[in-house]
Design a protein with these regions (language model features):
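Long, hydrophobic/aromatic-enriched structural stretches that serve as scaffold segments
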Residues: 55-115
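Terminal interaction module
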Residues: 1-72, 112-115, 119-178
Length: 178
C-alpha cells in the first residue's frame, strides 16, 4: 500500500471566531458518526502538547472482500464473505500544529480523501459558528432591531478555510516547519 503525506492548512481570518474554541468543537465532535449509504466514518481528534492528533476511521458497508495470492506461481483471486457485523475498515492519520494550524494527512488509495475530511470539519465548524451567532442574537432580547441582527450576522460571515498546502521546497524544508 502506497501512503502519501499531504500538507494542509486551516486558516481563520475572522477575529470574532476563537480558533481554539473551534478546535475544541472538533474534539467534542469525536463521538459523532458520519453515516452514508456505503460507509460510516468517525473522526477522532485529541489535543496533546503542541499538536492536535487525528484518526479517521471508515467502516465500509460491504459484505464481500477480495483476497489475492500466488499459489504454485499462479495468481488466484478469492472472494470472501464477511460474517455478521464484520466490516472492512480504512484508517487515515493526521496531525495539526497548534501554532500555525499547518497539518500533515496520511492518505492511501481508497481511503477518506483530504477534501472529504475538510467537508466534515467545515460542517462542524459552521455548526459551532452558527450557534455562536445565534447566542449573540439571543442576547439582544425578544425583538432585536434588524440592523443589530445584520451586524452580528456580518460579524460571523467569514468562516474557517481549509486548503491543501502547495510548496516547491524539498521535503526536508517542509518538515522543518513542524
Amino acid at each position: 500500500m502506497k501512503v502519501r503525506s499531504i500538507g494542509f492548512t486551516i486558516n481563520n481570518n475572522n477575529k470574532n471566531i476563537n480558533t481554539v474554541d473551534v478546535m475544541n468543537a472538533f474534539i467534542n465532535a469525536s463521538n459523532r458518526e458520519h453515516s452514508r449509504t456505503d460507509y460510516t466514518r468517525k473522526i477522532l481528534i485529541s489535543d496533546v502538547n503542541d499538536f492536535y492528533y487525528g484518526l479517521v476511521v471508515t467502516f465500509r458497508n460491504q459484505k464481500k472482500n477480495c483476497k489475492s495470492q500466488f499459489v504454485d506461481g499462479k495468481f488466484q483471486l478469492k472472494i470472501e464473505d464477511l460474517q455478521g457485523s464484520d466490516k472492512l475498515a480504512n484508517f487515515n492519520f493526521f496531525l495539526i500544529k497548534k501554532s500555525n494550524l499547518s497539518g500533515l494527512y496520511m492518505y492511501h488509495h481508497g481511503s477518506c480523501s483530504l477534501n472529504t475530511l475538510f467537508s466534515h470539519l467545515e460542517t462542524i465548524s459552521n455548526e459551532f459558528i452558527r450557534n455562536q451567532n445565534k447566542e449573540e442574537i439571543k442576547k439582544l432580547g425578544d425583538k432585536p432591531k434588524q440592523k443589530e441582527v445584520t451586524a452580528i450576522n456580518k460579524k460571523y460571515k467569514e468562516r474557517l478555510t481549509f486548503s491543501l498546502m502547495t510548496n516547491k521546497n524539498n521535503i526536508q524544508s517542509v518538515l522543518c516547519q513542524f
